Amino acid sequence: MIQFMTRLNVADNTGAREVGVIKVLNGSKRRYASVGDIVVVSVKDAIPSGTVKKGQVLFAVIVRTKKGAQRRDGTHLAFDDNACVIIKNREDFAPRGTRIFGPVARELRDKGFNRIVSLASEVL
């Protein structure tokens, strides 16, 4: 469960290492985000040569959560960290980076993030 002030690892090569959640989108009083949800984030830690800098406010999609998710077939999928991928805008869901590190959840394909799924090395 991702909420306001949660720190997330960044699973792409944009240059950001860690971001903090500012807002969970899609709902006026929505509190929690899970895999496949879009959040507004602020870059907390970044490498100097990256395309994003510390303090920038961006959109990101959640790709891994420690909380996990219950699937319809009864399986439960949880990851070792909370991670996101930075996207260009809310309309086309295109990732800003060209590589995605680590596994991502299969639920992203169902929610329309096909470009993120195609860049990922492993889909669980």
Curated annotation (Swiss-Prot):
CDD domains from the xrefs?
Answer: Ribosomal_uL14 (cd00337)
**Keyword line:** Ribonucleoprotein, Ribosomal protein, RNA-binding, rRNA-binding
Q: Which GO terms describe its molecular function?
A: large ribosomal subunit rRNA binding; structural constituent of ribosome
Gene Ontology CC annotations of this record: cytosolic large ribosomal subunit
- Disulfide partners: none
- Highest taxon of source: Bacteria
A GO BP term here is: translation
Q: Tell me the leader sequence span.
A: none
Q: Belongs to which family?
A: Belongs to the universal ribosomal protein uL14 family.
Subunit description: Part of the 50S ribosomal subunit. Forms a cluster with proteins L3 and L19. In the 70S ribosome, L14 and L19 interact and together make contacts with the 16S rRNA in bridges B5 and B8.
What is the protein's known function? Binds to 23S rRNA. Forms part of two intersubunit bridges in the 70S ribosome.
Protein name from the UniProt record: Large ribosomal subunit protein uL14
Organism expressing this protein natively: Mycoplasmoides gallisepticum (strain R(low / passage 15 / clone 2)) (Mycoplasma gallisepticum)
